């Protein structure tokens, strides 16, 4: 349960208590239950229509939130995962392969978080090593060779900052991905499904179209990190989350991303099938527009998109 959901939890407890009492004592409490369920629905809508940035940060980090592989199973047909960077090893924190979107062959890549403690250790909590980014680039170049559109799912706190990752060239692997992705001659569509953290997110995020789920975040640093750096107090992370403009609605307004995909009431984890359906519709729409461009036009479109991000004022 998240902090802002406490009022909902209290109503749910009352509903459960009434249902238990109704069953145990063989009394009719359905009218009271119906009233509370209606109240729960109203309160849920009220809370989720007025989420604050820090609330969305909590939702983006939720363990129950659907992962890249969850969405792949719903959206793409006959997906085959491909492994390894052909240089060092396979990285379970970065998954990728080929499948079909509406009958069209495509390449799909994304960071993969774990579902539980054991899986998170195996997936390194979705924080890829250099070999993960090199695997992603290998699959992108393969997609370009065979003319397949590329879809990437961004879901990471950041690239893994460990000693071994740095020794194997973490920053170089990400930098190379940025350069190579900028010039790909096939459509590239990226979607932030949870946290989009810093260079770790950008390493698979240089796309013609960048989309975000309604309760995802995209930032150069975590709110806690920003608060610690700016104000020497990580407890000010709520203020940092608001100041940094890291939520999907804010980034859409700032023209850093192209579109926001709405989530089911309560978050993507409440109805994965519905969320996947909305993502598939958005992917199909964006791809149909990008397929009107030739290879060089796609590369130029991508380059110009990122050139236009940001502004400054002279005084």
Curated annotation (Swiss-Prot):
Keyword ATP-binding carried by entry: yes
Subunit description: Acetyl-CoA carboxylase is a heterohexamer composed of biotin carboxyl carrier protein (AccB), biotin carboxylase (AccC) and two subunits each of ACCase subunit alpha (AccA) and ACCase subunit beta (AccD).
Residue ranges constituting the CoA carboxyltransferase C-terminal domain according to the UniProt record: 32-289
Family membership noted in the UniProt record: Belongs to the AccA family.
InterPro entries in the record: Acetyl_CoA_COase_a_su, ClpP/crotonase-like_dom_sf, COA_CT_C
One function term, GO molecular function aspect: ATP binding
Protein name as annotated: Acetyl-coenzyme A carboxylase carboxyl transferase subunit alpha
EC number(s) recorded for this UniProt protein: 2.1.3.15
Species this chain originates from: Staphylococcus carnosus (strain TM300)
Gene Ontology terms: biological process: fatty acid biosynthetic process; malonyl-CoA biosynthetic process
Its biological purpose: Component of the acetyl coenzyme A carboxylase (ACC) complex. First, biotin carboxylase catalyzes the carboxylation of biotin on its carrier protein (BCCP) and then the CO(2) group is transferred by the carboxyltransferase to acetyl-CoA to form malonyl-CoA.
